[in-house]
Every structure is written in structure tokens, then in C-alpha cells.
Amino acid sequence: GLWSKIKDAGKAVLKAAGKAALGAVTDAV
């Protein structure tokens, strides 16, 4: 349903944000 699509999209966004944050931290070190 629509709700599961929204949840999946939210998970994908969180994953991408986490990867970006991890990359930024790695670059800063």
C-alpha cells in the first residue's frame, strides 16, 4: 500500500543520509 511505499522511501532516505554523514566524517578525519 501507500504507507509501505512511504516507509520504504523513508528508509532509503535515512540510509543515504547516513552514508553521506559517514563520508563527511571520514573526509574530515
Swiss-Prot record:
Known tissue expression: Expressed by the skin glands.
A single cellular component GO annotation: extracellular region
Keywords, alphabetical: Amphibian defense peptide, Antimicrobial, Secreted
Top-level taxon: Eukaryota
Residue runs in coiled coils: none
Transmembrane recorded as keyword: no
Compartments where located: Secreted
GO biological process: defense response
Keyword check for Secreted: yes
Family under the similarity heading: Belongs to the frog skin active peptide (FSAP) family. Dermaseptin subfamily.
Function: Has antimicrobial activity.
Name of the molecule in the record: Dermaseptin-9TR
Native organism: Phyllomedusa trinitatis
Taxonomy of the source species: Eukaryota, Metazoa, Chordata, Craniata, Vertebrata
